[in-house]
Every structure is written in structure tokens, then in C-alpha cells.
From Swiss-Prot:
This is Cytoplasmic tRNA 2-thiolation protein 2-B. SUPFAM superfamilies: Adenine nucleotide alpha hydrolases-like (SSF52402). Plays a central role in 2-thiolation of mcm(5)S(2)U at tRNA wobble positions of tRNA(Lys), tRNA(Glu) and tRNA(Gln). May act by forming a heterodimer with ctu1/atpbd3 that ligates sulfur from thiocarboxylated urm1 onto the uridine of tRNAs at wobble position. Signal peptide: none annotated. GO terms for biological process: protein urmylation; tRNA thio-modification; tRNA wobble position uridine thiolation; tRNA wobble uridine modification. Pathway: tRNA modification; 5-methoxycarbonylmethyl-2-thiouridine-tRNA biosynthesis. Residues 196-215 are annotated as: Disordered. GO terms for cellular component: cytosol. GO terms for molecular function: nucleotidyltransferase activity; sulfurtransferase activity; tRNA binding. Residues 199-214 have a biased composition (Polar residues). Transmembrane segments: none annotated.
Length: 512
């Protein structure tokens, strides 16, 4: 019997292997399967491309946030997801596309090499690769360095007025009727307006590359290094980088006239962000941070068309259709698992996904059910009710029995500086280290008295998560000037409002 078993074992193994290799596509039922996305979801190469393209355009179509002829900025990082997003937009704008995308795209790449500790020579090498890739897309592109945050205006932290748009269906119908009435001449003109600009025209791409990829001033580079050096933890550095990147994207979008910004976060990335943001105290803003449309900025909306794709699907698409991402070192590259909350969460979710394939999809579906309930119409238009850094609605207006109030009380009791209002009022006009004495000799402990008085007024304008980020910074003076100026502006407005409060009419009095 043993000999018979040994004789038949190779045949049984070959039969199982032939059966697994002989799977056919679940869609066309004809071609052999080239990949397996999930258990039972086998696709051939052509059907997988059709499935991938359909999901992208269906995501944009069912949400109906991009109007015909609208300018959309594509946030490109060189990674797999944003590279696949750019390819989808590029193919959707071609003349042969069955359901053509009708918006006007532009691409933005932000050079974050200084924050990641890269030299200018290393950054130049990456920028040359980025520029060559973007030139092949024939889409207008912008390449800026992160150092430009030190030249941003304070208005970038102010919420813009949202544009009143007509009904989406009526706008599309009007656009199609206008196309038919204008005939062939109108169609060709519209195609020229919607067709992406040819970057290969003489001097166009070279001029853009030279103007956007020039070396930033050394003063700004040193300031950026000092800013990230002041953050004591990698968690705070990653949060700070995300905040500065968002401010720069918002400024470029407003300056160049883009009303929408596309980012390339995948389903896997958003699932990781869901858990990490809860750990970072951003649970109140999960619908904004993980939803399809983020409208916190008012005049510019952040949309995430790649949120339906897993990282596995994106990797398959890039592999089969020659989409070449560019590897760029990040802050957590070669870092240990416990180096930051974000990196630890990423390792945890990826390992869990390997053993339980429904982990990412479960987290993603959970995030879809979350809605923002703390914003009302009055708070949306009030700048003082929004965080100074992330521009999210403040989540610090909690009751005395809340966990936030308990945390604040514990923090105040643990401080060496007395928190009495009378003491703060008496010492508000005094300079630090008066009489030649140090702060420690003056009875204030090891903390500088001037910073102790300035920090509460600044922290009061931040949400709970941004307060934790600022708490991990050694100094607030290294922040960009537009942040400090906006904080001072809000303080002055608050003081002015207190002075004229008794002369203001309340809403009830006005209605009566």
C-alpha cells in the first residue's frame, strides 16, 4: 500500500497544480486567469484592466463632485497609488476613451528631501526622474520644494468661501447640449481646452522645470531642518510633515485656480490611517481624513478616487501595464516597527491582512459609515472655531465630565507653574528672567516663564491631536511665520470681540 501511495503522489500533485493553473477568467469565461485578487476573483489581463478602469470612473461618477471643465490638481508623490491615478487620468482624457473625463488636470509634486535628511545632489537625481516621468504624461505639472512653506501667506490658514454650484445633472446636460450645438468646430475647440497641454512643445517643459526645480534658499533649508529637529518624536515629525504638505498643496491649488485636488490614498492606506488617527486623537475627524471628499478648506475640495483599490490591486495594475513608480525615501524608511505610531499601525495592519484577508476591507467599510456631526452652519463660517494647523473644527469644546477635560486637569496639576488666573494676569506684562535672575532662580522651575505664558494662548487654537504634536516640539519659534502671524491675528480678533461684546446684538434680540 505504501508503494502505491508513493506511486500516485506525484500524479495527484500534478493534477492539483494543473487545476490551479487552469483557472479561467471569472468575467469573460474564456481566457486563462493571469492574477487572483481575492479568493474566487480570477481575472485575465484585459478584463482586469477593464475592471480597474471602470472602478476609477465609477467612483468619480457616483460621487458627482467634479464638474465638466473644472480644473483638478493631481497630488503626485511618485508612489504606486499616485502613479496609477495619474495613468488613469491620462487615459481617461484621450480621444479614444469611451467615457471621457471632462476636467482639466494638472500635476503637483512636492520635494520633501530636506525633511527626510537628503542632500541636494540626491534630491536633484530624484527630481530629474520625476520630471522625465511627468513630461511623458503631457499634463501640465508643478514641482515645488517643501521649503516654500516659509514664504506662504497667512491667508492659507483661512477657510475659503465654498462656491455655489448648480445641479450636477443640469450642468452636464448643459455641457452636452453646448457640444451638440457647436458641432464639429465646438467639439474640436472643447477637446483642445480639455486635452492636456503638450509638454514636448519647444521650451515649455524645460522652462517649467527650471523655474520650479531651482535650488531653494539656504536660509529656508536651514529653517526647515531646525523645524523638524525640534520635534522630539518621529510621530510628531510625520504629523508635522503632513500638515505642511497640506498647506502647500492648498496654496498651489488656490494660486493656480484649481478647485479640486486628487490624492492617491488607497483602501489599504486609508485603513491604516483610520487606526493611526484614532491613536493620535483625531477620531473626531475620521470622515474628513478618510472620506471620499474633504471639504474642510471651503473653496478647495480634497477627493480620493483611489480609495476603492487595495494596494494589491494597484501593484498588479502597475506590474501588468508598465506603470513605473519612483522610490523616494520617507521619514520612516528603514525605521524600526516601534519608531512611530503611524509606522507601527502600518506594520500591524499589513501583518493582520496577510493572515486575515478581509481586515482592510472591514476597516474601510467601517470608515464609510462615519459622518461629521460636530459641525453646524454657523461654525463652518467661523474661523476661530477651526484648528490653526489642520483647519479641522475644534474638538476641544467638551464638557467637564469628558475625557479631554480630565486630561487637561491632569496636565495642569502636573505643571510646576501655578495656573491661577490672577497670577497669569499679574505676570502677563513681565519679561522673562527679570532682574538678571534665571527662570529657575525666580521660582518658575526649569521652564521659561515667557514660553509658559505664550504656549496656552497658542495651544488654545489647536485641536487635541495638533496639541499633542506641538507638545512634542521643543520650541514654537521655529514654526513658519504664516502660522505665527495667523495665531497673532486670531488672538487680536478674540480680544477685540471681548471688548465690544456688550455692544453686539444677540441673534434672539435681532429676530425679535
Amino acid at each position: 500500500m505504501c508503494e502505491e501511495g508513493e506511486t500516485y503522489c506525484p500524479e495527484v500533485k500534478d493534477a492539483k497544480q494543473a487545476k490551479s493553473l487552469g483557472k479561467i477568467c471569472m468575467k469573460c469565461k474564456e481566457s486563462s486567469a493571469a492574477l487572483l485578487i481575492r479568493a474566487g476573483d480570477a481575472f485575465c489581463k484585459s478584463c482586469f484592466k477593464e475592471y480597474f478602469v471602470h472602478k476609477f470612473r465609477a467612483t468619480l461618477g457616483k460621487n458627482r463632485v467634479i464638474y465638466p471643465g473644472e480644473k483638478v490638481l493631481l497630488a503626485y508623490s511618485g508612489g504606486p497609488s499616485s502613479s496609477a491615478m495619474v495613468r488613469q487620468v491620462q487615459e481617461g482624457l484621450s480621444r479614444d476613451a469611451p467615457k471621457k473625463l471632462r476636467f482639466v488636470p494638472g500635476i503637483l509634486f512636492i520635494d520633501e528631501g530636506t525633511a527626510c535628511g537628503m542632500s541636494w545632489e540626491e534630491r536633484q537625481q530624484i527630481l530629474s526622474e520625476i520630471c522625465s516621468v511627468l513630461q511623458q504624461t503631457k499634463i501640465p505639472f508643478h514641482i515645488v520644494s517643501l521649503e516654500q512653506v516659509f514664504s506662504l501667506p497667512g491667508s492659507v490658514l483661512q477657510r475659503g468661501a465654498p462656491e455655489q454650484r448648480p445641479n450636477y445633472k443640469e450642468e452636464v446636460d448643459r455641457f452636452l447640449v453646448q457640444e451638440r450645438e457647436q458641432g464639429d468646430a465646438g467639439c474640436s475647440e472643447m477637446l483642445e481646452r480639455l486635452e492636456v497641454t503638450d509638454s514636448d512643445s519647444p521650451g515649455s517643459s524645460d522652462k517649467m522645470y527650471q523655474s520650479t526645480c531651482s535650488r531653494p534658499p539656504d536660509m529656508h533649508t536651514q529653517k526647515l531642518k531646525q523645524l523638524f529637529a525640534s520635534a522630539k518624536t518621529l510621530t510628531a515629525k510625520q504629523q508635522l510633515l503632513h500638515t505642511l504638505r497640506s498647506h502647500l498643496i492648498l496654496h498651489i491649488a488656490r494660486t493656480c485656480g484649481y478647485s479640486k485636488v486628487m490624492t492617491g490614498e488607497s483602501c489599504t492606506r486609508l485603513s491604516i490611517r483610520l487606526l493611526s488617527n484614532v491613536s493620535l486623537g483625531r477620531g473626531a475627524f475620521l470622515p474628513l481624513d478618510t472620506g471620499f471628499c474633504d471639504s474642510r478648506y471651503g473653496d478647495v475640495d480634497i477627493i480620493r478616487p483611489m480609495r476603492e483599490y487595495s494596494s494589491k490591486e494597484i501593484a498588479y495594475y502597475n506590474r501588468f501595464f508598465n506603470v513605473l513608480p519612483i522610490f523616494i525615501p520617507a521619514l520612516d524608511t528603514k525605521a524600526s516597527e516601534n519608531s512611530s505610531i503611524q509606522h507601527l499601525t502600518e506594520v500591524f495592519v499589513n501583518r493582520l491582512q496577510a493572515d486575515f484577508p478581509s481586515t482592510v476591507s472591514t476597516l474601510y467599510r467601517t470608515s464609510e459609515k462615519l459622518n461629521v456631526s460636530i459641525i453646524d452652519a454657523d461654525q463652518e463660517t467661523c474661523a476661530k472655531d477651526r484648528c490653526l494647523l489642520c483647519l479641522s473644527p475644534l474638538d476641544t469644546q467638551a464638557g467637564k465630565a469628558s475625557a479631554f477635560s480630565a486630561t487637561q486637569l491632569s496636565h495642569h496639576l502636573s505643571q510646576k507653574i501655578p495656573m491661577k488666573s490672577n497670577d497669569l494676569a499679574n505676570n502677563s506684562d513681565k519679561s522673562c528672567c527679570q532682574g538678571g535672575q534665571g527662570c529657575k532662580e525666580a521660582g518658575y522651575g526649569d521652564t521659561c516663564q515667557s514660553r509658559a505664558l505664550q504656549t496656552p494662548s497658542f495651544v488654545h487654537m489647536l485641536c487635541y491631536s495638533c496639541r499633542l504634536t506641538v507638545k512634542d516640539m521643543q520650541s514654537l519659534d521655529v514654526l513658519p511665520q504664516y502660522v505665527l502671524h495667523e495665531a497673532e491675528y486670531r488672538c487680536h480678533r478674540t480680544e477685540m470681540r471681548k471688548e465690544i461684546q456688550e455692544f453686539l446684538l444677540e441673534e434672539d434680540d435681532g429676530d425679535s
